[in-house]
Amino acid sequence: MAKQKTYIAIDLKSFYASVECKERNRDPLTTNLVVADKSRTEKTICLAVSPSLKSYGIPGRPRLFEVVQKVKEANNTRRWKALNRTFTGSSDDSTELNANPALEIDYIVAPPRMAYYLEYSTKIYSVYLKYIAPEDIFPYSIDEVFIDATNYLNTYQMTARELAMTMIQDVLKTTGITATAGIGTNMYLCKIAMDIVAKHIEPDKDGVRIAELDEMSYRRQLWNHRPLTDFWRVGKGYAKKLEEHGLFTMGDIARCSIGKSNELYNEELLYKLFGINAELLIDHAWGYEPCTMEQVKAYKPETNSVCSGQVLHCPYDYEKAKLIVKEMTDQMVLDLVDKGLVTDQLVLTIGYDIENLSNPNLKYQYQGEVTIDRYGRKVPKHAHGTANLEKKTSSTRLITNAVMDLYDRIVDEHLLVRRITITANKLVDEKSVKQEDEYQQLDLFTDYEAQRKKQAEEEEKLERERRMQEAMLSIKKKFGKNAVLKGMNLEEGATAKDRNEQIGGHKA
């Protein structure tokens, strides 16, 4: 009989914010701090919010203006309790604020330092390696790991909870950062224990929360849990579709999966809604997850496409946005060359700014389709199009020309642009591209000698371009991404130079 598996998921608490607090010799649990680049205006997304600041009703990934608004509301409430309704000072420490109602709530806005967070993450990973072999650890993100603890419990003569606590305490001692953990009989259950159950239990003196689930306790505790979006891999789209068919909980989905064929709710309904993905949804509804750590680490995804996206820090007009598209295309092609890939299909998506409809001077110029964004605001429908090339290539010239033609064809020149996404589809290894024999109808009027000469010249151009691309890549790898810049990268509004100094779209 196979040994019962035991998995542990560990999530570092408000990781970016905790790092910034420790670097200021402050307590991450009591310091009001938000990680955000306020130079991008108050509309910028916050990367992390400290636990004490979240206590004022601030979500984990708000816009900076939401933080400002929530703190302002909290201060208005506190002012009524202060003597003479006047603050005597301010503090960004929750302990001081709780002890003295006459203090105004303050907070620190820390600019992101992605490279530094990666260093911290590496340091924490080395702590896990003191207890667990690398083949039994799967880094899920910069601040979260899965651990297969099955073969370590007897070795250390510990329970899963004791092992998890030992590692978390070591991380706390080494870095000053605390964590939340989930323990389960499969990878799904340990993730759910961490994400949902642990959030509803009291932390210990160090802020540590640890929760456990097996298949039966999962069903008892979470079959009636709402909303569905709290569960791993259930997004708003899935939840909306399920609720439209009367399925509001994991228990509803589980019951639906065992319905008879002549009943309204049965397995076929789920497969009709979600196709093959219904199999995973049904497994998760029952608390099953057949995928093991070994299978996860052995999985190698096929590279069929690469995508590059950018949200502009302010609305760009037609020409300035075109410059950004050109920069992004140029960088994407270099990435293809670096990976030895070629493509024959490019997809461009342009998202317009809300100012197109909120500004009276622009609103009446637009007569096209209007959609509602995720914040409930009206915005012109995005532009979307595809460019197909005659052959697979990684030529900057050919791909850029195709994308520029596509941009001119699909984008409304009167609208302001806010989001740009470029995708290269149908990627294959350039070494695997076989030259297929080409057949053509001969005639007496074509100068085939001139045609062959033209083809030879084109091949020579492509070869020269390829040597230049490889030289640029070599220099950039040795001296940094900004070691070689093009003239367009220095034009007003260009973003490539700044983005080369970022990690994940944020300051390095």
Roles of regions detected by a PLM:
Residues F146, N388, T421:
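Short aromatic/hydrophobic contact patches that present stacked aromatics
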Residues L348, I422, G480:
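Hydrophobic, well-ordered secondary-structure elements that form the walls
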Residues D405, R409-S474:
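C-terminal hydrophobic structural anchor segments
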Residues M1-M293, L444, E449-A508:
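Gly/Gly-Pro- and Ser/Thr-rich, intrinsically disordered tail segments characteristic of DNA damage-repair
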Residues K13-F15, S39-K43, D353-L357, L427-K431:
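Short, charged/polar surface micro-motifs in flexible loops or helix N-caps
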Residues A9, D230, K236-V417, D437-Y439:
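DNA-contacting surface of Y-family translesion DNA polymerases
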